[in-house]
Amino acid sequence: MLKMESTQQMASSIINTSFEAAVVAATSTLELMGIQYDYNEIYTRVKSKFDYVMDDSGVKNNLLGKAATIDQALNGKFGSVMRNKNWMTDSRTVAKLDEDVNKLRMMLSSKGIDQKMRVLNACFSVKRIPGKSSSVIKCTRLMKDKIERGAVEVDDSFVEEKMEVDTVDWKSRYDQLERRFESLKQRVNEKYTTWVQKAKKVNENMYSLQNVISQQQNQIADLQNYCSKLEADLQNKVGSLVSSVEWYLKSMELPDEVKTDIEQQLNSIDTISPINAIDDLEILIRNLIHDYDRTFLMFKGLLRQCNYEYAYE
């Protein structure tokens, strides 16, 4: 007992099976060609293209629509069947179908499929024999109709005709490939030579830069040695200066408090860092000048109190 939509389900199943067959054909072809592929990507691409072609061409809707018409007829509803019958026998429909056929023929011709190829494909088909390399050529109904109409001629005469076979001049092809290879080889050699020259120049610049850096490092080392020696000399000079002043101070007839104060200032001089030592010496000299100035003022005041005058000679 057929269901209400059994024909539509069968048509939908055929469409889905066609899609699966397209996926299998695509993947098997890639495997035979030795091309690695992603099955999910192939499945997605084929499905997208298949759905677009079936929907855009109207084939899917046409098949499902005819299946729906058959289901309606099986369920006793012949209205859609009669409309389709009237549409198929209408002169405008026939003219439209004839126009579509002509368009398809012109499209095939533009793709290089000429009339001979179209007629032969329409008149013959090839049946493969399982397990054998040979095959059987079958005549289609169109070929049978042509034979019945006398539209088929058999030429028994032997006519030697040159077969229109696309021959390949392998020697010229080989020469062409050899020239391309030599040209490519020359370009590669030129690029390699240019790269080698650039690499040599880079190496020369690098060696030159290394020499400059080495010279600068040597100069820096010499300056560091000179600075170290100069610093040591200054330390010795400062130490000698402090010792000489201390010795000289002890030979003076100054009060012990003054000697002690000056010795403390001498001992506070940094003999390790010449820069700090110079600052300490500056402070010591300033203090001595200040003390000398105070002593001079006291002496000047004392002379005035004694009604004496002073003069430098």
Curated annotation (Swiss-Prot):
- CDD domains cross-referenced by the UniProt entry: NSP3_rotavirus
Report any one BP term from Gene Ontology: regulation of translation
Assign the protein's first listed, main location to one coarse class. Answer: host cell
Taxonomy, superkingdom = Viruses
| Keyword annotations from UniProtKB, A to Z | Coiled coil, Host cytoplasm, Host-virus interaction, RNA-binding, Translation regulation
Compartments, as annotated in UniProt: Host cytoplasm
User: Gene Ontology cellular component?
Assistant: host cell cytoplasm
| Region called Interaction with host EIF4G1, residue ranges | 208-313
Region annotated Dimerization, chain positions: 150-206
> Where is the stretch described as RNA-binding?
1-149
Q: Which cysteines are joined by disulfide bonds?
A: none
Listed under subunit, the entry gives:
Homodimer. Interacts (via the coiled-coil region) with host ZC3H7B (via LD motif). Interacts with host EIF4G1.
Family indicated by similarity: Belongs to the rotavirus NSP3 family.
Which protein, by its recorded name, is this?
Answer: Non-structural protein 3
The species this protein was found in = Rotavirus A (strain RVA/Cow/United Kingdom/UK/1975/G6P7[5])
